[in-house]
UniProtKB/Swiss-Prot annotation:
EC number: 6.3.4.19
InterPro entries in UniProt: Lysidine-tRNA-synth_C, Rossmann-like_a/b/a_fold, TilS/TtcA_N, tRNA_Ile_lys_synt, tRNA_Ile_lys_synt_N
Entry protein name: tRNA(Ile)-lysidine synthase
Recorded family membership: Belongs to the tRNA(Ile)-lysidine synthase family.
Keyword 4Fe-4S: no
Taxon lineage: Bacteria, Bacillati, Bacillota, Bacilli, Lactobacillales
Reactions catalysed, as given in the entry: cytidine(34) in tRNA(Ile2) + L-lysine + ATP = lysidine(34) in tRNA(Ile2) + AMP + diphosphate + H(+)
Designated gene of the protein: tilS
Length: 425
């Protein structure tokens, strides 16, 4: 194939339509060097600004020389190049994580929105076979995605429909370690695939076909499940066990960097079935939140650096606090004004719950934790509930419960009113 054929494919697919700057992961191998040649030659036609990024893994004697040559190549092409050196104990997984962390740093620094890698169809076959041998979930057998949005960036693999034999033999660096069978992918490439092709000469095409078929099923299920609110457990549990599993797996596709194992997936299923309330980290910065008949999976929110102190309100004063206007002894007008009997003799404290909090009801002291459970108050509301305290005792949990002192005691002690109005934050 000629270079213009690759350009036409890129334009037809519209890979770079949404991007002005793209970072190319440049390893120095044949596939990435040819991708460099195509992208650098046709920057104008593709309407992109190309940035190069290379990781020197420091695993071979030649790697430092290759780094110097890539710097020369970038200078000749008048393109910026960013280079980082891997350190620490080497493994395929650590190296991959290091590379992608570095690429994201480069993208953040340069304002690029696309990361381009030279993965091709042969890589796809190896990946699917590796996942099959490891016993991964069916949806992962669709293989590497041609385009993948991760956070605010898009990973583009424009060579995924081409085999390595489609690339012309141009200047590149040969990684001799690829011939060694120390790593799993190398054993797949050098040993397992050649043996399987003896049984079926079209084995690679067969594997790619299975991957595409699984992808079609995955997309179809996602489309058909659009009308089901999976986060509503009444809806989810109205289906058979098999359908529940498929719907839940499809829901998890929304979080591409979550990647639950089979055991973790089974644990999530069990939590949804057995626990009434639950909030706990699950994996990769995500947490599972369940509140009775609803659940959601979301990124863990960063905590504020400083916690808000409790508010002290004195008699004959007003203050706006966390979406409410509190008026101590000064009447507020309106239909939706809450009124709580209090004493004018001392200040009022407004805060969130603390460990050991109790509320007096019907003459009995009840722990807030038990009260919230009995009233089925969602965890989010428990944490955000405002507590009104006076004389060291809880007078009211705003919108939830009030200290019901006897009428005589109330008349003797509570000689004014705290007026509360809901306002916009």
């Amino acid at each position: 194939m000629r270079e213009p054929d690759f350009l036409n494919h890129f334009l037809k697919k519209g890979y770079f339509k949404k991007h002005a700057k793209a970072v190319l992961a440049l390893s120095g191998g044949l596939d990435s060097m040819f991708l460099f040649k195509v992208l650098s030659t046709y920057q104008k036609e593709l309407e992109i600004e190309l940035i190069l990024a290379h990781v020197n893994h420091k695993q071979r004697i030649e790697s430092d020389w290759e780094e110097k040559e890539l710097r020369k190549l970038a200078a000749e092409a008048e393109l910026p190049i960013y280079i980082s050196n891997f350190s620490g104990e080497f493994s395929e997984a650590r190296a991959r994580n290091f590379r992608y962390d570095f690429f994201q740093e480069v993208m953040k620094k340069t304002g690029a929105t696309a990361l381009v890698t030279a993965h091709h169809a042969d890589d796809q076959v190896e990946t699917i076979l590796m996942r099959l041998i490891r016993g991964t979930r069916l949806r992962y057998l669709s293989g590497i995605k041609e385009k993948q949005v991760v956070g605010e960036i898009e990973i583009i693999r424009p060579f995924l429909h081409f085999q390595k034999k489609d690339f012309p033999s141009i200047f590149h660096f040969e990684d001799t370690s690829n011939q060694e069978n120390h790593y799993f992918r190398n054993r797949i490439r050098n040993s397992y695939l050649p043996e399987l092709e003896k049984e079926n000469p079209r084995f690679r095409d067969a594997i790619l076909g299975i991957g595409n078929e699984i992808l079609d099923y995955d997309l179809a299920i996602a489309e058909l499940s659009n009308n089901t609110n999976v986060e509503n457990l009444q809806q989810l549990f109205s289906y058979s066990e098999s359908t529940q599993r498929v719907l839940l797996q499809t829901y998890l596709n929304r979080f591409p960097d979550l990647n639950l194992t089979k055991a973790q997936f089974a644990e999530v299923q069990q939590i949804l079935k057995s626990k009434s309330q639950y909030r706990h980290p699950i994996k990769n910065g995500y947490e599972l939140i369940k509140e009775y008949q609803q659940f959601q999976i979301c990124k863990i929110s960063p905590q504020a650096d400083e916690e808000e102190d409790e508010l002290v309100l004195h008699y004959q004063n007003q203050v706006a606090y966390q979406g409410y206007l509190f008026s101590f002894g000064l009447p507020l007008e309106g239909e939706l004004i809450q009124q709580i009997p209090v004493s004018r003799e001392t200040s009022i404290h407004i805060r969130h719950r603390k460990t050991g909090d109790v509320l007096i009801q019907n003459g009995h002291r009840k722990k807030l934790r038990r009260l919230f459970i009995d009233l089925k108050i969602p965890m989010e509301k428990r944490n955000s509930a405002l507590i009104i305290e006076q004389f060291g005792e809880i007078v009211s949990i705003l919108g939830i419960a009030t200290n019901n002192l006897s009428k005589k005691t109330k008349n003797d002690i509570m000689n004014t009113v705290l007026y509360i109005e809901k306002i916009d934050r």
